[in-house]
Amino acid sequence: MDKTQSRLRRARQTRIKIAELQVARLAVHRTNTHIYAQVFSPCGTKVLASASTLEAEVRAQLADQTGKGGNVNAATLIGKRIAEKAKAAGIESVAFDRSGFRYHGRVKALADAAREAGLKF
């Protein structure tokens, strides 16, 4: 079993447990250059809010910094944006789905920023 298969196995187990809870899910996906966050409905079929480093507003804010979006500063910005969008959609609490990634670095920065912006998990 290689690194990617292990991550996907962990992600699958997490999603099964979150589905049993029937709560909104904040899913994070990380690549070398970007980070993405989505809030899914409790049934898991609809995306209620999303934010990523590919958005024009985010890219403009990150333009003065080095890198495009593969750093902790970008993850912090995305965490704040996803919390604001989720609260605007009427979602106060979510279950955090790290998609099998270690809770460290950019994933942790996004989660901490979302908590500071008022999202509960």
From Swiss-Prot:
Q: Name one GO cellular component term.
A: cytosolic large ribosomal subunit
Q: Which cysteines are joined by disulfide bonds?
A: none
Entry keywords, A to Z: Ribonucleoprotein, Ribosomal protein, RNA-binding, rRNA-binding
MF terms (GO), sorted A to Z: 5S rRNA binding; structural constituent of ribosome
- Choose any GO biological process term that the UniProt entry carries and state it: translation
Spell out the InterPro entries in the cross-references: Ribosomal_uL18_bac-type, Ribosomal_uL18_bac/euk
Against SUPFAM superfamilies, the record matches this protein to: Translational machinery components
Span-the-membrane segments of this chain are none
- List the NCBIfam families hit by this protein, alphabetically: L18_bact (TIGR00060)
**What's the subunit arrangement here?**
Part of the 50S ribosomal subunit; part of the 5S rRNA/L5/L18/L25 subcomplex. Contacts the 5S and 23S rRNAs.
Describe the task this protein carries out.
This is one of the proteins that bind and probably mediate the attachment of the 5S RNA into the large ribosomal subunit, where it forms part of the central protuberance.
The family note in this entry says:
Belongs to the universal ribosomal protein uL18 family.
Which PANTHER family does the record cross-reference, listed alphabetically?
39S RIBOSOMAL PROTEIN L18, MITOCHONDRIAL, LARGE RIBOSOMAL SUBUNIT PROTEIN UL18M
Report what the protein is called.
Large ribosomal subunit protein uL18
